[in-house]
Amino acid sequence: LQSVLPIACQDDPLSTFYLEKEFETRHTYDLYRQAERFDLIHAHWPTLAPYFSAFTTTPTLVTYGYIEKELHEYYRAHFPQCLPVCVSQAQRKMLGDDSIPVVYNGIDMNEILFNDKPEDFFIIVGRMTPGKGIAEAIRIAKKARVKLLIVGHVTTHLPWSEGYFLKEVKPHIDGDRIRYIERLPYREIVQMMSKAKGFLFPLQWDEPFGLVVIEAMAAGTPVVAYPRGSMPELIKHGETGYLLDSEDEMVEMIDRI
């Protein structure tokens, strides 16, 4: 297969939300146009593949990065040839369908260097959305009087992403105690995670998986998180991180790390 675009949408400054959806559709169409060449099509996002799967005998496997329960039920009813996979037990429970197999996400351990000599700062990595808990991480870091590095992309054509950043995050960035980097290559992100004393993850939603959590743990960085979504499946409390119920508990734990 070949890309239908010369550059990834997220790296194209001229890209818009509507162009991204157009190119996503174009890419999926180009794939299914050649479906008979393959034994299996594996889709990592569920919005388009189920519809195209109805026009081929080649089976489609869809890994649910995230999906609403109502949408899953619609796919089950109308596209039985499309086989879903959940990324955590928590996600399967949220969908209310015990028949879905669970296959956890993985990472390339060769890309991540373990570091047992951290520097004096904490980190949070994630999209600039309220659900990731970045504003809460800032508040926790300030209460604990520790330095925090934020790495997270602002999606400028989505008002709620840019608005969240401008209102809840940007006013706190001082370049010293609270630092912010919008974009970094993957290797540099995991390097920064490995240097951090801890990874703060006060989620405000039920995260189906959370790749950054296992990336941080692989780098030797303990994760301090709320026990929401898949976090209890990924983190062994007291061994690979800490599952806590409040900001005050997180502040207290930070003092011990």
Regions found by a protein language model. Give the residues of each.
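Catalytic cores of nucleotide-sugar-dependent glycosyltransferases that transfer UDP/GDP/TDP-activated
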Residues: 1-257
